[in-house]
Amino acid sequence: MRNIMKYKGYWAEISYSDEDECFCGEIEGLKNDLISFEGNTVKELKKDFKDAIDDYLQLCKLTKSKPEKQCKGSLNVRLGTELHTKAKIKSLEKNISINELIKDAVASYLKTN
């Protein structure tokens, strides 16, 4: 399992830099902005993570720019021909779109895992 920190709708994977002897992280999935943080202790790391996001949101407010989101709500999924065919047939049987079928499947998976 990976180490993930979450705050105000943003998340980052945490790693340890042996070279710098500190914990570090970067908010992934932003196309135009870079938010990184670090700390020598977990407490420092958490504080710097929250401060980095708060600073980013404050900067966006001051510059009247919209903060980027890590997930836009759409993605491309490569299912392979066989799984795609089965999903399409099942969506037709249920009288729903294939998109709705995949959303239901992901929601069901997340609920049980």
Report residues per predicted region.
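N-terminal segment of the canonical double-stranded RNA-binding domain
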Residues: 1-23, 51, 58
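Generic structural detector for well-ordered beta-strands
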Residues: 15, 38, 76-78
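Positively charged, aromatic-enriched nucleic acid-contacting surfaces
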Residues: 22-34
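A short, exposed loop/beta-hairpin motif centered on an aromatic-Gly-Thr core
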Residues: 32-44
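A short, charged, amphipathic alpha-helix used as a generic interaction element across diverse proteins
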Residues: 41-55
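Short Lys/Arg-rich basic patches
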Residues: 62-78, 82, 92-94, 100
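Short, basic amphipathic alpha-helical segments that act as recognition/interaction helices
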Residues: 98-113
